[in-house]
Amino acid sequence: MGVAAAAGRLLAAVDWEREAYPAYRDFFALPLFAVFFLVVRYLLDCFVFEWIGRKLIFGKEKVDYEKEETRKKIRKFKESAWKCVYFLSGEILSLSVTYNEPWFTNTKYFWVGPGDQVWPDQKIKWKLKAVYMYAAGFYTYSIFALMFWETRRSDFGVSMSHHVATVALIVLSYVFRFARVGSVVLAIHDASDVFLEVGKMAKYSHCDLLANVAFLLFVVSWVLLRLTYFPFWILRSTSYEVLLTLDKKKHNFDGPIYYYVFNSLLFSLLVLHIYWWVLIYRMLVRQIKTRNVGDDVRSDSEGEDEHED
């Protein structure tokens, strides 16, 4: 309790509205955030998720918790529970920081303001820096967790590519002064992943109604946020609107580098969205035919027998 109280006082003492330019040295804190997620997950796995998983999956049924099949079910539940905790916390944090900003509802303010600031010469608030460190720390941790901790699924390569691209996107968008855009990208991604992980946990817990509802919300949010809002609002702004404000004489060298590198990463993310949507759509059609919409998506039918962490 003493450590938590001290941390609370430290956070309360920070002026989160203070503005500063993004800098490479800010990422010196990244290893601390990665270790933070490692420790928190270990504690939740041992003292919270294990107990909840046993209760929801098996109820009062007497089972041997040391059997490999039993451990496999609990392990998958704990993975989804952990991801749900992160995505929900990340969504709440992103929305709390961005919701009242003008660029949350009008993409042109990604590039102008406050005052006479124009991209890329824009400062950001410390609270936005915190959102970035939180997300970058999680995905850095996730790369190692995917290799050494979590169940190896059949889309391991795609998931690893996603994590690496996400870390690169977060770091580069920060140092290239795209943090405003990045915070909204984080928010629209975390939202659909919350529904996905809730649906998985419901499926593992044999709660078919909740699994069906969560899966349908996941599909709807994926289409609206990742396949509609992301390309037609976010990518339009990063590829077109930004050029309307860029001082090409002042930034004739660094401006194009920032522009092409960041947009290349964003479009690669869109390619992954489309790839996963093809998988989701195929599974949705199959599940509608079998009248069982709650089955898992994005490769939960993993090759676990080939590799177990």
Swiss-Prot record:
Keyword field contains Cell inner membrane:
no
Keyword field? Endoplasmic reticulum, Lipid biosynthesis, Lipid metabolism, Membrane, Transmembrane, Transmembrane helix
Pfam families in UniProt: TRAM_LAG1_CLN8
Q: How does it sit in the membrane?
A: Multi-pass membrane protein
Is Transmembrane there in the keyword field? Answer: yes
A Gene Ontology molecular function term of the record: sphingosine N-acyltransferase activity
Disulfide bonds listed in the record: none
Give the transmembrane ranges: 27-47, 84-104, 130-150, 156-176, 215-235, 260-280
Query: Highest taxon of the source?
Result: Eukaryota
**InterPro entries xref list:** Lag1/Lac1-like, TLC-dom
- Domain TLC intervals: 75-289
One GO cellular component term noted in the UniProt record for this chain: endoplasmic reticulum membrane
Please list the GO biological process terms of this entry. ceramide biosynthetic process
Q: Where in the cell is it found?
A: Endoplasmic reticulum membrane
Q: What does this protein do?
A: Mediates resistance to sphinganine-analog mycotoxins (SAMs) by restoring the sphingolipid biosynthesis. Could salvage the transport of GPI-anchored proteins from the endoplasmic reticulum to the Golgi apparatus in ceramides-depleted cells after SAM exposure.
Q: Tell me what this protein is called.
A: ASC1-like protein 1
Q: Report the source organism.
A: Oryza sativa subsp. japonica
